[in-house]
């Protein structure tokens, strides 16, 4: 069996879909369906069982046996970069992750987890090294701290001549694609621009968006990276982006091209995001490629075109 936490979320449900596509259906999805709209992400997927996050954690902490587990994809987290309740964030993203990690280590279960490019902050160098990390929000800090916890485990194991079972962290950059409709304000720019055009409006970007460049990665490519590491058993913390930064304008142009209408409008940059907003991200893929991962990534034009074709039928 494979366990996917956050399995009703965007990346988690797409991982379940990718597993289904290679013939794997023995999957336990763990999530919190308090936001009941997420159920739509699971309707067309084949899984063995569903379990509430709190019930799952209770069983993990009790050391309960789930039977043979081939791998755990830990995508479950509070992913709102605008959430400033640090107690809640650290409990969800740090403490819970440690519990599950140690459960997997004790049983030598491969543990593949979601980190984030939010760990980097304002740097212009995006290498998986401590000197380039400096989160701008408590979400990024929760991910940064868990990465550092994993690093300490590796260091301790090395000092004692031990080898740990597989731990693989993925620093997701700006992920977009199907199954994100439940995310509200945290959904991708492509999602919001598409909805604006469908509502008869022009697509709207923040003032200065022509200067804001991000590494936008299509969720299908994120899944390919996850499955490659599951199948090849490589440990480490790796960037999961395309290696290319493209502007928000390019995203808007791709959405406009799909619809054949619309002109970009600019709106004022929100006060609450000033000082906590990454204006530039671009994954350094040196470490990913050195590990042997040869997944090819879609450009914004290619990925948004595929996304629009799926969501607009």
From Swiss-Prot:
**One of the GO biological process terms:** ADP-L-glycero-beta-D-manno-heptose biosynthetic process
Q: Which residues form the active site?
A: 139 (proton acceptor), 183 (proton acceptor)
Co-factor note (free text): Binds 1 NADP(+) per subunit.
Q: Which InterPro entries match?
A: Epimerase_deHydtase, Heptose_epim, NAD(P)-bd_dom_sf
Q: What's its catalytic activity?
A: ADP-D-glycero-beta-D-manno-heptose = ADP-L-glycero-beta-D-manno-heptose
Keywords of this entry: Carbohydrate metabolism, Isomerase, NADP
Its Gene Ontology molecular function terms?
ADP-glyceromanno-heptose 6-epimerase activity; NADP binding
Q: What disulfide bonds does the UniProt entry report for this chain?
A: none
Pfam families annotated for this entry? Epimerase
Q: Can you tell which superkingdom this protein's organism belongs to?
A: Bacteria
Has UniProt tagged this entry with the keyword Isomerase? yes
Q: Which cofactor does it need?
A: NADP(+)
The record's EC number reads 5.1.3.20
Which residues are recorded as binding NADP(+)?
Answer: 10-11, 31-32, 38, 53, 75-79, 92, 143, 175, 183
Give the UniProt family note: Belongs to the NAD(P)-dependent epimerase/dehydratase family. HldD subfamily.
Q: What is known of its domains?
A: Contains a large N-terminal NADP-binding domain, and a smaller C-terminal substrate-binding domain.
Q: How does it assemble?
A: Homopentamer.
Q: What does this protein do?
A: Catalyzes the interconversion between ADP-D-glycero-beta-D-manno-heptose and ADP-L-glycero-beta-D-manno-heptose via an epimerization at carbon 6 of the heptose.
Q: Could you tell me what this protein is called?
A: ADP-L-glycero-D-manno-heptose-6-epimerase
- What is the source species? Vibrio vulnificus (strain CMCP6)
Q: What is the lineage of its organism?
A: Bacteria, Pseudomonadati, Pseudomonadota, Gammaproteobacteria, Vibrionales
